[in-house]
Amino acid sequence: MSIRLTLAAFAVALSTALAPAVAFAQAAPVPVQAPRSPIAVFAAGATHVELPAPNGRTVDLSVWQAPDERAVVIFSHGFNGSPAAYGRMLSQWVGEGFTVVAPLHVDSLRHPHHADYDNQAAFATRIADLAIARGFVRATHAGKPLIAAGHSFGSLMSLIEGGAVTVAGPLGDPHIKAVVAFSSAGDLPGVIQPATYADLHTPTLMITGDADLVEGYVTDWHAHRSPFERSPAGDKMLLVFAGADHSLVRNADEADFDLMLRTTTDFMEAYGLGDAAARARLDALTAPEGVSLERR
């Protein structure tokens, strides 16, 4: 079945079921910060690829090519966000040999046609964007391992790519070797089902904080534990930072950022590349004060 037909089915089947996802998107805070020079430099370094999408859309892919490419990360930004906003982390991954390919979703405030789409469109168009991005990577980076990563609403997308099954049905990609999820979209009623994570066998690293809330919607940070707790045991890790909020991936202090960088890089090397030394570092990792680390 083509992506176009699949998305047409989504538009009908999910019109009411995805209302909680819309509520989350409307409630999710959108940080407003003056651009920092390193981020601006990172954004300017992207190659942009425009690809056709269903219903006459085009998808803008930001591609940050690693000089010595070892694998490719498909990254999905948070609601209303944009790929370059995560330059602090993504630039480090690129330096470690992970090319980053990141679509600009229609819910982004930087999308040129943002006003043409309501929040209801965010879910289905994101699914299509990421399928197109993966197809692009398979065609242009043939043979390179694929890793899915994302933040907030984008982390839900990465979990779906890794095998999580929402009300939309199974949409996972068996080529995904590992998932790195910063925060999550929480337990969205009507979208996240009791068995949503039952088939999430892909190695998954979940990163959150005990102040990771979305005002008026996610009132208990423990909801971000669900992908870790409700997926099959084996190759799952959870990092929880004391006092960290929903923007941890962007606003972490140097010590927390360094831990996230080391852990995500080792995780991608261990499971994306089959690197035994990286796996040994993960196994030996201990959490510093103010951070909890769980494995299952």
Show the residue positions of the predicted features.
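The feature captures the conserved acid-bearing segment of alpha/beta-hydrolase catalytic domains
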Residues: 171-243
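Glycine-rich His-Gly loop
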Residues: 75-79, 152, 209
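Bacterial N-terminal signal peptides that target proteins for export
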Residues: 1-10
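Alpha/beta-hydrolase-fold serine-hydrolase catalytic core, especially in secreted/extracellular enzymes
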Residues: 243-245, 251-296
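An N-terminal hydrophobic leader/cap segment in hydrolases
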Residues: 10, 14, 18-63
